[in-house]
């Protein structure tokens, strides 16, 4: 049997690059070291004021500066969920090296459980406290679940399929599976696949309910 085929005779799919931004670290090596050490990432919440919450600790992604990936202007036009997802994708693409495929053969499947909740919460607060004229014109493109897939595609010039998978905690794994399908059915030669999420005060409050 050809080394290019699996035991079912299907084309083998290779992972050529990886990127990660998570509580255990902001690169593959540091995350692997943290996991092997069995180190807990739980700590007091610093992303927002959690003093009124019943639960005031969580696992945050720390030591991450989205400006280094977006620049000082563009970073304000993206939700934190996109900051994390795009940065991880950019690192994965860099580690993969030459992609070896035309832009129309490069696809993106970026998963999320919900999407830009930070943007949603902030703009709902603005709407009710300061009026509709103060809502950000970037509100919809910042909070929609497929924002990360769109940003990755546009910034890297990919013109193949680009979409979001939203299946709760299974979303990232489902995205990888969809990437495999795209390659096997000939819809793409390269797929950037993974998941991203960013918790907020409201999500912490919801999960803390008894």
Task: Give the positions of each predicted feature.
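ACP-dependent fatty acid/polyketide chain-elongation machinery
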Residues: 1-74
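Acyl-thioester C-C bond-transforming condensing/cleaving domain
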Residues: 2-10, 25-26, 37-45, 94-105, ...
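Short secondary-structure transition/capping motifs
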Residues: 20, 74-85, 137, 141, ...
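Generic hydrophobic secondary-structure packing signal
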Residues: 30, 34, 81-88, 171, ...
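A glycine- and small-residue-enriched flexible loop/hinge segment at structural boundaries
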Residues: 47-98, 119, 145-159
